[in-house]
Each structure stands twice: as C-alpha cells, then as structure tokens.
C-alpha cells in the first residue's frame, strides 16, 4: 500500500522506543512498549477501508495509473501496433500478389481460348476448302470419265454402223447377183433364149428403183 508524505510525517517511526517516566510515588513500569505496537494498532484501525477507496492513496493510485497507461501505450506503439501493422501489410501484399497472379492466369486463359477458337475456325475453313476441292476434283474426274466413255461408245457405234453398212452393201450385192442369175434362168426357161447380162442388170435396177420409190 502506498502512503502519502503527510501520512509518513504524522506516523511515528517504526522501531522507535517510547519510555514513559513514572510520576513521583508511582511504581516503575515493568516493561516499555515500542512504536511497532502502536503502528500495528493503527494498521488494525485502518484495515476496515478497501485500499482503492482510501482517499489518502488517491494521488499515488492516479500516478501509478498514469505510469501503467503510459507503459501500455508505449508497448502498444512500439511492439503490438508495429507487429499487427506488419502482419496486415504482409497479408495485404500477399493478397495483392495473389490477385495479380489470378489476373495473369486469367489473361493467359483468355489468350489460350482465343488462340484455340482461331485455330478451330482455321481448321474448319481448311476442311471446308478441302471438301470443296475434293468435290470439284471428283466432279471433274466424273465428267472426264463420262466424256471418255461417251467418246468410246460413239466410236464403237460408228464402227458398228460402218460394219453394218458394209454387211448390208455386201448382202445387197449378193442379192443382185442372185437376182440376175435367177432372172436369167427364168427367162431361159420361159422364152428358151439366152438373155444378155446387161439387159438383166438393167431390168433389175429398174425394178429396184421403182420399189424404192
């Protein structure tokens, strides 16, 4: 417990002995009491007041409160606040770094998606071009093959027609010879005279002309 200066001056010194001088005719006291007992009695007399509510110690309480608050303020300012500030600053820096990294990764992802879309569009265009080229090539080949087949068929048809015409001419020639021989034989049988070949051929030719007309 803290004591004030007035209380210290008014209180007797601990350990100081006090000897009472007996009056004339009084017996000598057997023992002297010390100031320690007086102080002890004073403490017992003041023990009924709760120390924080003791008005005699308000000044010392305020002083120690100010000292304690000052020390706590210095502790907060020099130790706790810098540590908390450092932690917050580090966390803020880490968050900012994470945000920058996330932005960088997002930009890379966007670039990759854009590149993929461009490559996909180019691949589709190339596939379409290849398909169109293949269709054009197939059509051209089909047209060429058809033209070649048609030309071959036309050539074969012309050859066949020529052959048929030759066979027909040959057949007609044979028929003419047979007709001449037959006509000569018939005339010989009917008339009994030999007919000239020129006359028979002329008659057959005239008959053929009339039949064809």
UniProtKB/Swiss-Prot annotation:
Keywords: ATP synthesis, Cell inner membrane, Cell membrane, CF(0), Hydrogen ion transport, Ion transport, Membrane, Transmembrane, Transmembrane helix, Transport. Its main location: membrane. It is a single-pass membrane protein. GO terms for molecular function: proton-transporting ATP synthase activity, rotational mechanism; proton-transporting ATPase activity, rotational mechanism. Residues 1-45 are annotated as: Disordered. It is found in: Cell inner membrane. The chain crosses the membrane at residues 57-76. InterPro entries: ATP_synth_b/b'su_bac/chlpt, ATP_synthase_B_chain. GO terms for cellular component: plasma membrane; proton-transporting ATP synthase complex. PANTHER family: ATP SYNTHASE SUBUNIT B, ATP SYNTHASE SUBUNIT B', CHLOROPLASTIC. F-type ATPases have 2 components, F(1) - the catalytic core - and F(0) - the membrane proton channel. F(1) has five subunits: alpha(3), beta(3), gamma(1), delta(1), epsilon(1). F(0) has three main subunits: a(1), b(2) and c(10-14). The alpha and beta chains form an alternating ring which encloses part of the gamma chain. F(1) is attached to F(0) by a central stalk formed by the gamma and epsilon chains, while a peripheral stalk is formed by the delta and b chains. F(1)F(0) ATP synthase produces ATP from ADP in the presence of a proton or sodium gradient. F-type ATPases consist of two structural domains, F(1) containing the extramembraneous catalytic core and F(0) containing the membrane proton channel, linked together by a central stalk and a peripheral stalk. During catalysis, ATP synthesis in the catalytic domain of F(1) is coupled via a rotary mechanism of the central stalk subunits to proton translocation. Component of the F(0) channel, it forms part of the peripheral stalk, linking F(1) to F(0). The b'-subunit is a diverged and duplicated form of b found in plants and photosynthetic bacteria. Belongs to the ATPase B chain family. This is ATP synthase subunit b 2. It comes from Agrobacterium fabrum (strain C58 / ATCC 33970) (Agrobacterium tumefaciens (strain C58)). The gene is atpF2.
């Amino acid at each position: 417990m803290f004591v004030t200066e007035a209380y210290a001056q008014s209180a007797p010194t601990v350990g100081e002995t006090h000897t009472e001088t007996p009056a004339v005719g009084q017996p000598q006291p057997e023992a002297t009491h010390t100031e320690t007992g007086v102080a002890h009695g004073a403490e017992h007399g003041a023990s009924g007041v709760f120390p924080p509510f003791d008005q005699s110690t308000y000044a010392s309480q305020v002083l120690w409160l100010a000292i304690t608050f000052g020390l706590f303020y210095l502790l907060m300012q020099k130790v706790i606040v810098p540590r908390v500030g450092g932690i917050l600053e580090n966390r803020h820096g880490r968050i900012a770094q994470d945000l920058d990294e996330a932005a960088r990764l997002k930009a890379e992802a966007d670039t990759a998606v854009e590149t993929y879309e461009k490559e996909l569009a180019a691949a589709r265009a190339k596939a379409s071009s290849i398909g169109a080229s293949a269709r054009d090539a197939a059509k051209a080949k089909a047209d060429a093959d058809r033209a070649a087949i048609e030309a071959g068929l036309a050539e074969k048809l012309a050859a066949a027609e020529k052959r048929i015409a030759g066979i027909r001419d040959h057949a007609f020639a044979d028929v003419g010879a047979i007709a001449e021989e037959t006509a000569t034989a018939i005339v010989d049988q009917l008339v009994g005279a030999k007919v000239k070949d020129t006359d028979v051929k002329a008659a057959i030719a005239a008959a053929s002309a009339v039949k064809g007309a």
